[in-house]
UniProtKB/Swiss-Prot annotation:
Top-level taxon of origin: Bacteria
InterPro entries per record: DnaJ, DnaJ_C, DnaJ_domain, DnaJ_domain_CS, HSP40/DnaJ_pept-bd, HSP_DnaJ_Cys-rich_dom, HSP_DnaJ_Cys-rich_dom_sf, J_dom_sf
Predominant location: cytoplasm
Lineage: Bacteria, Pseudomonadati, Spirochaetota, Spirochaetia, Leptospirales
A Gene Ontology biological process term: response to heat
J domain mapped to chain residues: 5-70
Protein name per its UniProtKB record: Chaperone protein DnaJ
Disulfide bonds: none
Binding annotation for Zn(2+) 1: C152, C155, C205, C208
General function of this protein: Participates actively in the response to hyperosmotic and heat shock by preventing the aggregation of stress-denatured proteins and by disaggregating proteins, also in an autonomous, DnaK-independent fashion. Unfolded proteins bind initially to DnaJ; upon interaction with the DnaJ-bound protein, DnaK hydrolyzes its bound ATP, resulting in the formation of a stable complex. GrpE releases ADP from DnaK; ATP binding to DnaK triggers the release of the substrate protein, thus completing the reaction cycle.
Localization terms from the record: Cytoplasm
Binding site for Zn(2+) 2: C169, C172, C191, C194
Entry annotated with the keyword tRNA processing: no
One Gene Ontology cellular component: cytoplasm
Organism of this sequence: Leptospira borgpetersenii serovar Hardjo-bovis (strain JB197)
Length: 371
């Protein structure tokens, strides 16, 4: 069964406007919200599915990327596909105050609203890496540079100046949330005093401004395994952003995008190559050499009477299977090259060949021959 599109999940058409998308999501969110369907795993999954779809389709850039590349080209906060683009995979439920505020009276819903105090895991990052077809076939190590949030060295991530420390928020008691009940809904809203941290800082660190985090650039070596294709996602554990309050780093996801090749066309794990041959080679047969993706040459026999467009297979000369043994094949499409100019002697021989074949070729007045 094919994977449902984000439009199908929300029940809207591809031409739906922002209000239609928001309205469709609002209905699904109310219907499947976990606080309304406690213990119902199916409802929880449908809520997550609808939220993921809305997170992509509400953002014009993400929606455009999704329409063009599908799910392979988008992630939470995706910002395009140029070399080195990276994305923050923050908790997608954190951005929907405008939706839940309409029917919960403001703030976040109870789903995903756990305790906020203490250290938290950092956000994941996405990095789009352009890879040549040769590197995708052979594998290669790339050196990339990413901007990311790291723990402040002066305050060790606490956000408080030296000699001081954060104190428990008096309004939420350190939970980071204010919870209230409306009918069968139990709604947890972010504490406005500590903004969900559970602590307050009276004397903030001057280096990081009390955030506990600083943006820095980090260079990382990435090993691209043989066989990757456009949309392949490589996980680099612990290379995402540092978490608040000294929390652990998230992960880095490197998404590969294979560049177009001037000779080869990739179809799955097979490669297609167009190779020109002469008229004589097509008629008489020959043994020719063809380039392969590993930079070498492979010998291939052209049988007598080969026609233009005929396809020959070089077994095992295609792309490697990612994470497995074996390779695809290379398919060579031959094209007979007709000379634009011929010598007088060549013309005489071709005319003699035509007469021998019973063809009546009148003398041409054109100048397609050279001396």
């Amino acid at each position: 069964m094919s994977e449902r599109s984000y439009y199908d999940i929300l029940g809207v058409s591809k031409s739906a406007n922002d209000e239609e998308i928001k309205s469709a999501y609002r209905k699904l969110a109310i219907k499947y919200h976990p606080d309304k369907n406690k213990g119902n795993k199916e409802s929880e999954e449908k809520f997550k599915e609808a939220t993921e779809a809305y997170e992509i389709l509400r953002d014009p850039k993400k929606r455009q990327a999704y329409d063009q590349f599908g799910k392979a080209g988008v992630g939470a906060g995706a910002g395009g596909f140029g070399q080195g683009a990276y994305t923050d995979f923050s908790d997608i439920f954190g951005d929907f105050g405008d939706i839940f505020g309409d029917f919960f009276g403001g703030g976040r819903g109870g789903f995903g609203g756990g305790r906020r105090s203490g250290s938290q895991r950092g956000s994941d990052l996405r990095y789009n890496l352009e890879v040549s077809l040769e590197d995708a076939a052979l594998g290669r190590e790339y050196k990339i540079e990413i901007p990311r949030l790291e723990s402040c060295g002066d305050c060790n991530g606490s956000g408080a100046a030296k000699g001081s420390s954060p104190t428990t928020c008096p309004d939420c008691g350190g939970s980071g949330q204010i919870r209230r009940t409306q009918g069968f809904f139990s709604v947890a809203t972010t504490c406005p005093t500590c903004r969900g941290k559970g602590t307050t800082i009276s004397n903030p660190c001057k280096t990081c401004g009390g955030q506990g985090l600083q943006e820095k650039r980090r260079t990382i070596n990435i090993k691209i395994p043989p066989g990757v294709e456009t949309g392949s996602r490589l996980k680099v554990s612990g290379e995402g952003e540092a978490g608040p309050n000294g929390g652990s780093h998230g992960d880095l996801y490197v998404v590969t995008h294979i560049k177009r090749h001037e000779l080869f066309e990739r179809q799955g794990n097979d490669l297609i190559l167009v190779r020109k041959i002469t008229l004589a080679q097509a008629i008489l047969g020959a043994e020719i050499e063809v380039p392969t993706i590993d930079g070498k040459k492979a010998k291939m026999k052209i049988p007598e009477g080969t026609e233009s467009g005929q396809v020959f297979r070089l077994k095992g000369h295609g792309m490697p299977y990612l994470g497995a043994y074996g390779k695809g094949d290379q398919h060579v499409v031959v094209k007979i090259e007709i000379p634009k100019k011929i010598t007088r002697r060549q013309r005489e021989l071709i005319e003699a060949f035509a007469r021998e074949s019973g063809e009546n070729i009148p003398g041409s007045k054109g100048k397609i021959f050279t001396k």
